[in-house]
């Protein structure tokens, strides 16, 4: 199992020691052109997690490859995955085409970007365009909105995806004391512990549909949470919102994982893989 961060939940330039505790650092989503992002406030705490409406703020592809990536590479010894975003298939593909293979281990395609249709055929179109543009491994990152998980997973696999990441945030809204949205933009992406049941269901359904590697994320804060992701079929696990509150979360989750497995009768977490699929035979690449 590899331990990753969810894209956008960790700045390795300001907290390299946290990133070094992970097996893989996933960058913020990079788009072809620089983006300022949404107006503040764009983050709000909730009872069960947090909302964000960052708006894909990033320096743009050229500046990222020229300035940010070399700095990340100088600070980190582990794998770096680039989160790729865009507003059309060719925008994704062009960033993949420009990605320096010697500096990156994989590309995670953020298929939940604004104006991107999340229908299976649309997701597959983006993956196919990126597959034609790069030999780097491609992980398709999916949201839990408005699609059949298995159908979408099968579509992106047929289009050339090498792995699946899920889930991205749920759309949510909170109100302040004056009954106005706490975020300037209105609704935002909801994440945190309360997202875990949604994420587990998505990982479980995805594993029934594919033998590809799966990065499970959404509400993971403890070793037990990570074990549940593995039991549902995740080969790797990512930490998200917890990183904002606990910089020691990677070490803590990793240390607690096998204890959590032993608590339910497994010698280690590896033996719990797909335990939630006891009724069917599961094969994994």
Regions found by a protein language model. Give the residues of each.
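Glycine-rich phosphate-binding active-site loops on the catalytic face of alpha/beta enzymes
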Residues: 28-32, 106-113, 163-173, 219-220, ...
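N-terminal capping/small domains of soluble enzymes
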Residues: 1-80, 86
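Short beta-strand/loop segments at the ligand-binding rim of alpha/beta enzyme cores
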Residues: 1-4, 75-82, 133-144, 207-217
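Glycine/Thr-rich beta-alpha phosphate-binding loop at enzyme active sites
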Residues: 50-51, 58, 111-121, 152-212
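Catalytic cores of alpha/beta
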Residues: 14-19, 90-101, 146-159, 204-210, ...
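Alpha/beta catalytic cores of nucleotide-metabolism and tRNA/nucleoside-modifying enzymes
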Residues: 190-210, 221-285
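Glycine-rich beta-to-alpha transition loops that act as phosphate-gripper elements at the mouths
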Residues: 8-9, 83-87, 142-148, 167, ...
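Conserved, mostly hydrophobic/aromatic
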Residues: 5, 25, 64, 82, ...
């Amino acid at each position: 199992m590899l331990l990753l961060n969810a894209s956008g939940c960790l700045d390795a330039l300001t907290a390299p020691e946290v990133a070094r505790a992970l097996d893989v650092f996933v960058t913020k989503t990079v788009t072809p052109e620089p983006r300022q992002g949404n107006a503040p406030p764009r983050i709000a705490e909730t009872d069960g997690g947090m909302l964000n409406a960052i708006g894909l703020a990033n320096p743009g592809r050229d500046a990222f490859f020229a300035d940010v990536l070399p700095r990340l590479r100088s600070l980190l010894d582990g794998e770096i995955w680039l989160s790729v975003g865009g507003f059309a298939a060719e925008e994704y593909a062009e960033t993949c085409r420009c990605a320096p293979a010697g500096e990156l281990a994989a590309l995670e395609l953020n298929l939940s970007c604004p104006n991107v249709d999340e229908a299976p055929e649309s997701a597959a179109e983006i993956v196919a365009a990126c597959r034609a543009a790069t030999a780097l491994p491609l992980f398709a990152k999916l949201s839990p909105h408005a699609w059949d998980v298995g159908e979408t997973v099968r579509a992106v696999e047929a289009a050339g995806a090498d792995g699946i990441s899920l889930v991205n945030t749920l759309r949510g809204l909170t109100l302040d004391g004056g009954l106005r949205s706490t975020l300037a933009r209105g609704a935002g992406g909801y994440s945190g512990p309360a997202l875990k049941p949604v994420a587990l269901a998505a990982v479980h359904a995805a594993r029934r549909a594919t033998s590809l590697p799966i990065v499970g994320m959404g509400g993971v804060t403890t070793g037990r949470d990570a074990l549940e992701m593995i039991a549902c079929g995740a080969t790797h696990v990512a930490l998200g919102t917890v990183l904002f509150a606990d910089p020691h979360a990677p070490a803590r989750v990793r240390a607690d994982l096998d204890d959590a497995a032993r608590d339910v009768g497994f010698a280690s977490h590896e033996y719990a893989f797909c335990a939630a699929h006891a009724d069917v035979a599961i094969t994994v690449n």
